[in-house]
Amino acid sequence: MSVPVPEFAFELALCARLEATTDWLPARQLGGGVAARGRRVVDVCAVVPGPGFDERAAVAPGEIPAPVLEGSVGVGEAVPAAEALDCPPERREAVVERAVDLGVLERERRGGRTLVRRTTRYPEGWFDRLIAVENKPDLDRPGDLRRQLRHDAAVGLFDEVVLATADHVTGAHLNRIPDAVGVWRVDPATGERTVVRDPAALPVDEPGIEPVAERPDRTEVAVVAPAEKAQVRRRIAERAYGKGWRTYDPPPCASAAVTDDGRPRCTHFDRVVDPATECGRDCPGFERDAPPDFDPAALRDARTPWGADPEGAGRRQAGLDRFG
């Protein structure tokens, strides 16, 4: 009986490898639904840069809030935030504050109202493709794998969908998943991948069919329009751009270390660990100490096209009201 491969370590190894061998921007744990947005979470989403990527990189290092991109805020005359941003009043101020902090909005106050304008135009076409990767290192423990992959293939939200596994892949395995889904066999230690089957391009510009609820006797579905998919695709790309995959903090332990590519490693167990679930007082190797140095932004800046501190037009123009 084989020893199970921890999914967290497997996922990080793959992200690190993709980062080292492509110009993609991998990010972890992103929503992958349209009609039922909290129902599907994708393990890894890789953003493939498009022709306008440098323009996007020059705007801001973080995720631009969706209400700013989808609202009626332009680069010309300042408009009332309450009218231009489609979000609950209790959230609006935080959205404006975040966008101003990023340098994508200027803010002013007139007559007790908050007015906003964009500092620069948003570059369309900055990403070329979105690639969803479902990690299942052990195919003998598939869980909801078949349902998840069928969902992704039917919705067509991502340009390509791939199953990543550490197992030997048989014809029987391939027959259980949609033909459009690609398969990678991934070394769980290094993240090195072998293509077992290439993914097919999914129809992202066509309507999709999304399962939204499952009953004992039927599955309820929703038809998602191309415009809805395009909006969610941009949200996913923005989320991935701002989030990345190093979304953890090393624990305050003498055994804690960080690999050169930024994965949390335990010297006591000599392996990559998940700080959120494996570290703490209950661990036999725990010895309280200062956590190791860890700068995920610097690592990402050095290893990808993403920039931690862009000198873009948005930031320069935002200097007028930064932010009062």
Regions from the language model: what does each represent?
Residues 33-35, 120-123, 150-152, 172-174:
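Short, flexible, glycine/charge-rich loop motifs used to bind or transfer phosphoryl groups or to couple energy/partner
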Residues 43-144:
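Conserved catalytic cores of phosphodiester-cleaving nucleases, focusing on short active-site segments
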Residues 2, 16, 20, 90, ...:
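Non-catalytic C-terminal interaction segments of nucleic acid-processing enzymes
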Residues 39-40, 127-128, 156-159, 179, ...:
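Structured loop/turn residues at beta-strand edges in well-structured enzyme cores
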Residues 1-23, 27-42, 55-57, 68, ...:
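Nuclease catalytic cores
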Residues 34-58, 173-175, 180-182:
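Internal hydrophobic scaffold segments of catalytic domains
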Residues 142-178:
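Short, charged, amphipathic alpha-helix that recurs within catalytic cores of restriction-modification
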Residues 133, 162-164, 182-184:
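Hydrophobic/aromatic beta-strand patches that form the interior of the parallel beta-sheet core
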